[in-house]
Amino acid sequence: MKNNSQLLMPREKMLKFGISALTDVELLALFLRTGTRGKDVLTLAKEMLENFGSLYGLLTSEYEQFSGVHGIGVAKFAQLKGIAELARRYYNVRMREESPLLSPEMTREFLQSQLTGEEREIFMVIFLDSQHRVITHSRLFSGTLNHVEVHPREIIREAIKINASALILAHNHPSGCAEPSKADKLITERIIKSCQFMDLRVLDHIVIGRGENVSFAERGWI
């Protein structure tokens, strides 16, 4: 009964002030629902966030790290992985249904949800029509921890196949630092030059790091 009464506090706070009023600890407690033996759910949530440093660290952790917290088992690990996947799918659906793109912020949020936590570099392309409405998005290339080989002609082939007029490029840095490398800049230039011959416009290249991202367009590089 103690766990249920502890959970009621963030729940009542949410109902009165809205979900955004909850702290990270309170929000996590809502999802966990129960604590462990001798530890109420709010205390458990606080301990978990302290152990992983942030919600990002918690939701992208592997089971070996997760199980190191005393009293935490596979059920709670599955719950939290489910939350992360729900968020990813939510942005996936939102991207399709809210075209054209509402803002650069929404684009970055979507890409962050898709590429955060990947252990290898993934190169992704969002394909848009002449009105900059999303046609589809695709993970075209997969690499290693610090490199992904990208072939501009394959990007162009896919764009022609679906009659795209514009592209947004994106890839992640598993290291966590979103600052573009020299290689990132060079491949972007190659893609832009290749696309110009086919009357395709590259709107941006966004590099995703751990809780941060860098836009080539905002830097004035495109």
From Swiss-Prot:
Residues 100-222 form the MPN domain. PROSITE patterns: MPN (PS50249), UPF0758 (PS01302). Keywords: Hydrolase, Metal-binding, Metalloprotease, Protease, Zinc. A motif (JAMM motif) lies at residues 171-184. The keyword NAD does not apply. One of its GO terms (molecular function) is metal ion binding. CDD domains: MPN_DUF2466. Zn(2+) binds at residues 171, 173, 184. GO terms for biological process: proteolysis. The keyword Zinc applies. It comes from the Bacteria. InterPro entries: MPN, RadC_JAB, RuvA_2-like, UPF0758, UPF0758_CS, UPF0758_N, UPF0758_YicR. This is UPF0758 protein YicR. It comes from Shigella boydii serotype 18 (strain CDC 3083-94 / BS512).
